[in-house]
């Protein structure tokens, strides 16, 4: 087959693949615990899987905690597994205002200088000196997905939300690339409500990269 024809056909296939939609995951408030903090809150207990999540190996656990801030508390906040090296609490702006916190907007794992909160279970209580964030909206991709979409780790893009009565465009969506990632965009409940997302019909579509 002619080389130029192969190049042309390959380009057409990639262009079509870039038009595919991206599944949406809505992140409610949740906690990732370190092994040490987990044992303080749930001594002698095994972290029990309630249901698997969209990313391979990740799951919602049966265990929950309360988050206690200066002006109130949020009860029954789900623990996500597996356990991590450092405890991280992810809430929305609405949640933060409700309990009197001024949490920074960060990517997962960027916890230096973030705010504190008290975590309480039936068996224990810990004061987390830092670790509370509002998660930046982002898209998980494998290296192959990133190559197909023409994006790189850490890049920000524009994404359109489709399949709702309130179509919306999100700017500054961060690309997160790793071998074990499955294609999925993550937004929080505030963002989902703004887009009128109710149920599983909504999807995301990559609109524009910002290099």
Swiss-Prot record:
GO molecular function ontology, one term from the record: acyltransferase activity, transferring groups other than amino-acyl groups
Q: Where in the cell is it found?
A: Bacterial microcompartment
- Main subcellular location of this protein, as a coarse class: other
Residues annotated as binding CoA: 26-28, 78, 193
Q: Catalytic activity, per the record? A: propanoyl-CoA + phosphate = propanoyl phosphate + CoA
Is the keyword Cytoplasm assigned to this protein?
no
Q: Which GO terms describe its biological process?
A: propanediol catabolic process
Pathway-wise, it operates in: Polyol metabolism; 1,2-propanediol degradation
Q: What are the entry keywords? A: Acyltransferase, Bacterial microcompartment, Metal-binding, Transferase, Zinc
Residues the entry annotates as binding Zn(2+) 1: 30, 32, 90
EC number(s) recorded for this UniProt protein: 2.3.1.222
Q: How is the cofactor bound?
A: There are 2 Zn(2+) ions per monomer; Zn(2+) and CoA bind inbetween the 2 domains in each monomer.
Tell me which domain of life the UniProt entry assigns to the organism this sequence originates from.
Bacteria
Q: Per UniProt, where does Zn(2+) 2 bind?
A: 138, 140, 186
Q: Which spans of this chain does the record mark as coiled coil?
A: none
Q: Which residues bind phosphate?
A: 84
Q: What Gene Ontology cellular-component terms does the record carry? A: bacterial microcompartment
Q: Which family does it belong to?
A: Belongs to the PduL family.
Function according to Swiss-Prot or TrEMBL: Involved in 1,2-propanediol (1,2-PD) utilization within the bacterial microcompartment (BMC) dedicated to 1,2-PD degradation by catalyzing the conversion of propanoyl-CoA to propanoyl-phosphate.
Q: Which PANTHER family match?
A: PHOSPHATE PROPANOYLTRANSFERASE
> Domain comment, in the record's words?
Formed by 2 beta-barrels, each is capped on both ends by short alpha-helices.
Q: What is this protein called?
A: Phosphate propanoyltransferase
């Amino acid at each position: 087959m002619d080389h130029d024809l192969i190049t042309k056909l390959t380009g057409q296939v990639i262009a079509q693949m870039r038009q595919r939609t991206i599944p949406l995951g809505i992140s409610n408030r949740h906690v990732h615990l370190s092994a040490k903090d987990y044992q303080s809150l749930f001594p002698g207990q095994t972290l029990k899987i309630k249901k698997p999540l969209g990313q391979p190996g990740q799951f919602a656990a049966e265990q929950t905690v309360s988050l206690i801030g200066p002006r109130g508390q949020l009860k029954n906040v789900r623990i996500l597994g597996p356990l991590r090296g450092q405890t991280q609490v992810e809430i929305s702006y609405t949640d933060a205002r409700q309990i009197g916190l001024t949490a920074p907007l960060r990517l997962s794992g960027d916890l230096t200088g973030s705010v504190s909160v008290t975590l309480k279970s039936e068996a224990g209580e810990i004061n987390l000196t830092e670790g509370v964030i509002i998660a930046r909206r982002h898209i998980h991709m494998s290296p192959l997905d990133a190559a197909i979409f023409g994006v790189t780790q850490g890049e920000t893009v524009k994404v359109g939300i489709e399949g709702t009565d309130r179509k919306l465009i999100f700017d500054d969506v961060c690309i997160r690339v790793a071998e074990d990632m499955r294609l999925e965009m993550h937004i929080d409940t505030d963002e989902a409500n703004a887009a009128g997302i109710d149920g599983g019909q909504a999807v995301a579509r990559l609109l524009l990269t910002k290099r």
